[in-house]
């Protein structure tokens, strides 16, 4: 053993002498990275005991942001997808619900109304208050409309019909316009009540359970 002295104290520390020519094989490296890997926000973060009514969600894009961040499903990191082509910004915090999956093979999207922007990669508790059916370039891409369950200004809302009409118009206009300068068509249909959102989340939870089960059986 080679002894290395800590100059800041009288205490010595002994470390094994290592051969600098030794390299890790793939098996060693895989075991090491598995032990030290960060949690995957889609799979490792629990959705919460009150789901599908109140649930955890991960923020990808902060309120007021123009950068379109999204989850990289392989690594679990948040990547930059693009910068919005227009001058509009996200009206509220936007992210996804862990342990859900939709028909497009992505986790369920959620727009969370609250007072302040939240850092990308943070997670919070949200309450479903409505569903915004949306068609993005011919494909279904519905959004859950939610409020932060721990924000005193918004947590009392239980259904989307309780929101001021201007707030709904703001949300609709953003999603109708945010891809126009990319020559991409987005259609937003009539907002649906809280129960429709709760049912959609429950369906996405069931699809996720089936997705994981199928993966384990391969």
Curated annotation (Swiss-Prot):
Signal peptide interval: none
UniProt superkingdom: Eukaryota
GO terms under cellular component: cytosol; nucleoplasm
Pfam families: Pyrophosphatase
Residues forming the catalytic site: 90
GO molecular function, one term: magnesium ion binding
Binding site for substrate: 68, 82, 94, 178
Top-level EC class: hydrolase
EC number in record: 3.6.1.1
Catalytic activity reported: diphosphate + H2O = 2 phosphate + H(+)
Compartment annotation: Cytoplasm
Keywords annotated in UniProt: Cytoplasm, Hydrolase, Magnesium, Metal-binding
Residues annotated to bind Mg(2+) 1: 104, 109, 141
SUPFAM superfamilies attached to this UniProt entry: Inorganic pyrophosphatase
Family of the protein in this entry: Belongs to the PPase family.
Protein name per Swiss-Prot or TrEMBL: Soluble inorganic pyrophosphatase 2
Organism lineage string: Eukaryota, Viridiplantae, Streptophyta, Embryophyta, Tracheophyta
Gene that encodes it: PPA2
């Amino acid at each position: 053993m080679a002894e290395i002295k800590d100059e800041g104290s009288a205490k010595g520390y002994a470390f094994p002498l290592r051969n600098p020519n030794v390299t890790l094989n793939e098996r060693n490296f895989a075991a090491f990275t598995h032990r030290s890997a960060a949690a995957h926000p889609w799979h490792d973060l629990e959705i919460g005991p009150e789901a599908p009514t109140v649930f955890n969600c991960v923020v990808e894009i902060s309120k007021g942001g123009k950068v379109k961040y999204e989850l990289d499903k392989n690594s679990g990191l948040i990547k930059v997808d693009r910068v919005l082509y227009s001058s509009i910004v996200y009206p509220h915090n936007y992210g996804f619900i862990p342990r859900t999956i939709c028909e497009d093979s992505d986790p369920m999207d959620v727009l969370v109304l609250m007072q302040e922007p939240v850092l990308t990669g943070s997670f919070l508790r949200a309450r479903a208050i409505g569903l915004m059916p949306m068609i993005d370039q011919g494909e279904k891409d519905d959004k859950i409309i939610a409020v932060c369950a721990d924000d005193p200004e918004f947590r009392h809302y239980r259904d989307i019909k309780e929101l001021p009409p201007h707030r709904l118009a703001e949300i609709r206009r953003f999603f109708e316009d945010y891809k126009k300068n990319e020559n991409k068509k987005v259609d937003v249909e009539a907002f649906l009540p809280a129960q429709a959102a709760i049912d959609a989340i429950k369906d996405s939870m069931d699809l996720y359970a089936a997705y994981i089960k199928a993966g384990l059986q391969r």
